[in-house]
C-alpha cells in the first residue's frame, strides 16, 4: 500500500465521538454571524455542531495532522463549505489571533464569540498501537500528539532521563504513590522500547497488593509520560491566560477536562483571574445515557466562563 492510500485509510478509520456536545453548544450559544475557535478539533464534532446550530465561521486547531485531515473530510461531507472553516496544524499554546484568526477589513484579528477546548487523548489516538498511548496492544513508546514533531518521545524519557526526572513526573503528573520504586525499576530495566515492555516493568515494580485493583498499575505512569512528552499542562496554562485576549467581551470559553490535574488548573484560573466570570460553579458531567454510549465520557468535566466586559 502506498503512503497516500495508507493516510486515507487512517482518515477513514478516525472516528472520535465528541463529549458533552449539547452542553457546549448550549453555553457557547452560536448565532448567525458568530465566529468560534475550536482549539482541539479532533474528529470535528464540536465544530460541526457549532456550525450546524448557527455559527458563521470556525477556526479549528489540532496538533495531530491525521485528526485535522479527518475533521476536514467529515465537515465537507456534512456540507460545510470551506469558507466557513479555517484549519491549522497547530498546538493551541502557539495560537496567535492576528496570524491564525479571522481578520476584519483593516487586517486586524477579530476576537471570537466563543472557544471550546476538549482536552486529553482522542479514542483514535488511544486505539492506534503505533501512537504508543496505550498498553492494551504492543506499540512503540512514542506518545507525541503530533507524530511529525521533532521532540522527545516517551522512549526518550524512559531511557535517557535521570531517574529523578522520572520520579518527579510520576508524582506531579501521575500522582503515583510508588513513583520512586517504579522509576528505579525502569532504570534497571533499560532500554525499553514498547508499551507492553513498560507496562510489564511497572507491574513488576509495584507491591502485589497494588496489582489487584481495577486500574492497571501502569495507567498513571502512561498518563504522566504523555503529559510530560506533550507539555500538556503548560499548554493549558497558556490557553487559560491567553483566551481572554482572543474573546470578545462576554465571549465564552468551554473547557472539557478528563483528569483532576486539568480540572484543578481550569477551576483555579476561572476563579482567580478577574478577566473571567464563572458560569458553571460546579463542573457539568455527562448524563448516564452519554456515558453508556461513549465510555470515554465517564471522566469528562465541563467548566465554562465568560470574558468579563
UniProtKB/Swiss-Prot annotation:
Entry keywords, A to Z: Cytoplasm, Methyltransferase, rRNA processing, S-adenosyl-L-methionine, Transferase
Domain of life: Bacteria
Reactions it catalyzes: cytidine(1402) in 16S rRNA + S-adenosyl-L-methionine = N(4)-methylcytidine(1402) in 16S rRNA + S-adenosyl-L-homocysteine + H(+)
GO biological process, one term: rRNA base methylation
Location of region: Disordered: 289-309
Enzyme class: transferase
GO CC terms, sorted: cytoplasm
Major place of residence: cytoplasm
Assigned EC number: 2.1.1.199
Subcellular location: Cytoplasm
Gene Ontology MF term list: rRNA (cytosine-N4-)-methyltransferase activity
PANTHER family hit by this protein: 12S RRNA N4-METHYLCYTIDINE METHYLTRANSFERASE, S-ADENOSYL-METHYLTRANSFERASE MRAW
Functional description taken from the UniProt entry: Specifically methylates the N4 position of cytidine in position 1402 (C1402) of 16S rRNA.
Family: Belongs to the methyltransferase superfamily. RsmH family.
Listed name of the protein: Ribosomal RNA small subunit methyltransferase H
Protein source organism: Synechococcus sp. (strain JA-3-3Ab) (Cyanobacteria bacterium Yellowstone A-Prime)
Amino acid at each position: 500500500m502506498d503512503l497516500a492510500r495508507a493516510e486515507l485509510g487512517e482518515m477513514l478509520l478516525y472516528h472520535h465521538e465528541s463529549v458533552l456536545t449539547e452542553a457546549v453548544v448550549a453555553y457557547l450559544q452560536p448565532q448567525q454571524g458568530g465566529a468560534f475557535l475550536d482549539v482541539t478539533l479532533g474528529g470535528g464534532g464540536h465544530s460541526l455542531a457549532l456550525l450546524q446550530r448557527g455559527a458563521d465561521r470556525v477556526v479549528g486547531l489540532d496538533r495531530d495532522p491525521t485528526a485535522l485531515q479527518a475533521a476536514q473530510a467529515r465537515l465537507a461531507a456534512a456540507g460545510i463549505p470551506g469558507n466557513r472553516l479555517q484549519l491549522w496544524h497547530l498546538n493551541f499554546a502557539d495560537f496567535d489571533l492576528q496570524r491564525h484568526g479571522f481578520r476584519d477589513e483593516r487586517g486586524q484579528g477579530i476576537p471570537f464569540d466563543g472557544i471550546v477546548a476538549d482536552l486529553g487523548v482522542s479514542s483514535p489516538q488511544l486505539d492506534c498501537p503505533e501512537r504508543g498511548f496505550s498498553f492494551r496492544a504492543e506499540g512503540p513508546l512514542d506518545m507525541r500528539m503530533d507524530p511529525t514533531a521533532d521532540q522527545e518521545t516517551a522512549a526518550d524519557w524512559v531511557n535517557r532521563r535521570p531517574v529523578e526526572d522520572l520520579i518527579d513526573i510520576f508524582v506531579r503528573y501521575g500522582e503515583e504513590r510508588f513513583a520512586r520504586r517504579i522509576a528505579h525499576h525502569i532504570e534497571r530495566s533499560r532500554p525499553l522500547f514498547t508499551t507492553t515492555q513498560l507496562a510489564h516493568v511497572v507491574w513488576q515494580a509495584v507491591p502485589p497488593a497494588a496489582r489487584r485493583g481495577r486500574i492497571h498499575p501502569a495507567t498513571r505512569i502512561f498518563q504522566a509520560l504523555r503529559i510530560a512528552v506533550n507539555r500538556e499542562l503548560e499548554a493549558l496554562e497558556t490557553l487559560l491566560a491567553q483566551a481572554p485576549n482572543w474573546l470578545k467581551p462576554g465571549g465564552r470559553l468551554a473547557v472539557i477536562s478528563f483528569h483532576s490535574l486539568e480540572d484543578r488548573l481550569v477551576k483555579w484560573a476561572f476563579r482567580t483571574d478577574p478577566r473571567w466570570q464563572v458560569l458553571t460553579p460546579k463542573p457539568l458531567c455527562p448524563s448516564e445515557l452519554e456515558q453508556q454510549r461513549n465510555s470515554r465520557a465517564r471522566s469528562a468535566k465541563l467548566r465554562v466562563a465568560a470574558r468579563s466586559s
